[in-house]
Amino acid sequence: MDDDLKKKTQETANRLFGKGIKMAPSYLTWKEFDRDLANEFSLFITGRLYSRTVLTLPERQMVACAMLAALRATDELRLHVNAALNVGCDAKKLAEVFFQLATYAGMPAVNEALHVFRDVLKERGEWPIK
């Protein structure tokens, strides 16, 4: 395995998820079925894709949160809302990202995203948004 890629993957993961990473349940599930494939996905997604510099990590996380909210993928959304806040996304802007979904993903998706967002903010001691 390329040591530079492995190092970049770990550094990016630490920025997104903090030390003592709580991996997404989907990653753990993949790992149960095929450890090598799960690791390859991790290297590609975190080490290569998330390490690109065209978008900042906060911008990437806002995109990820919007997509996950539209898909109503709440477990992954919870993980990426935390990551967004970890890399400096403004909570008011992230709320606005979720409001914008109403037109394209519908109110149920917005409501679900806001519930996840509020729960994460409460867990972090950052609720209500100031």
Specify the residue positions occupied by each region the protein language model found.
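N-terminal alpha-helical segment
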Residues: 42, 59-60, 77, 94
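Short helix-capping/linker segments at secondary-structure and domain boundaries
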Residues: 71-78, 109-111
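Alpha-helical transition-metal enzyme core signature, strongest for iron centers
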Residues: 6, 70, 101-105
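C-terminal binding/interaction regions
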Residues: 85, 89-130
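Acidic, glycine/proline-rich low-complexity segments that act as flexible tails and inter-domain linkers
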Residues: 1-57, 112-130
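Short, solvent-exposed interaction modules
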Residues: 68-71, 86
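Short, structured motif recognition centered on aromatic/hydrophobic residues
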Residues: 60-68, 98
